[in-house]
Design a protein with these regions (language model features):
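Short helix-terminating capping/connector loops at secondary-structure junctions
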Residues: 29-31, 122-125, 175
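SAM-dependent Rossmann-like transferase core, predominantly class I methyltransferases
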Residues: 56, 66-148, 152-167, 182, ...
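Conserved SAM-binding strand-loop segment of SAM-dependent methyltransferases
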Residues: 173-185
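N-terminal auxiliary segments of SAM/dcSAM-dependent transferases
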Residues: 2-91
């Protein structure tokens, strides 16, 4: 397969073509090759999704070009989810650090949290929240952001997962509101 031009747009299309030919599986943040390639290219080049399309046609440096090609090839050869390659996943409109110590956040619960579980829950009456099996802490942190008056307990059996959740509570400045607890289900609660 020939190398692409040195623009983000060309790199995205080249990556998507490589992903399709490799038969990659998606579902950890994206659901198709083009979105997955765009996510990796834009992340590597630090291009925000809110940038005008014209930035996609500007040539990148040799160094950045090589970095992008390496990451796209790594996605094909390792078959690891893009979130693990970028150390980042989005949940409920918020970025989270992730690595292989936790599952990649992907849940329809994000939409419920963003809507404060309306119409089933009165947000003013929520004072405490428990997230069991917190992993990266994404559900607990998104709940803390949505229910600002609530105390949130986030429990997990895995110390490794709690270490990742700790990174995320600090990233979102919620150390004082989200308590991380090592617990096998309810054993330490």
């Amino acid at each position: 397969m020939s190398r692409p031009d040195k623009t983000p747009r060309a790199l995205i299309h080249w990556g998507a073509d490589r992903f399709d030919k490799a038969g990659l599986v998606y579902g950890h943040g994206t659901d198709n090759a083009l979105d997955e390639a765009a996510s990796l290219v834009l992340h590597t080049l630090e291009i925000g999704y809110d940038q005008p399309d014209t930035v996609l046609d500007v040539e990148v440096s040799e160094t950045d070009y090589a970095r992008v090609l390496r990451l796209l090839e790594q996605r094909v050869t390792s078959r690891k989810p893009a979130a693990y390659l970028m150390d980042e996943a989005w949940f409920a409109g918020m970025p989270f650090y992730v690595d292989e110590r936790v599952l990649v956040p992907r849940s329809p619960i994000a939409e419920l949290i963003s809507a404060q579980f309306s119409p089933w829950v009165d947000p003013d009456r929520v004072t405490s929240i428990l997230d069991i099996g917190t992993g990266s802490g994404c559900i607990a942190i998104a709940c803390a952001a949505a229910f600002t008056q609530a105390r949130v307990d986030a429990a997990d059996l895995s110390r490794d997962a709690l270490d990742v959740a700790r990174i995320n509570t600090a990233r979102h400045d919620l150390e004082g509101r989200v308590q991380l607890i090592e617990s096998d289900l309810f054993s330490a609660l």
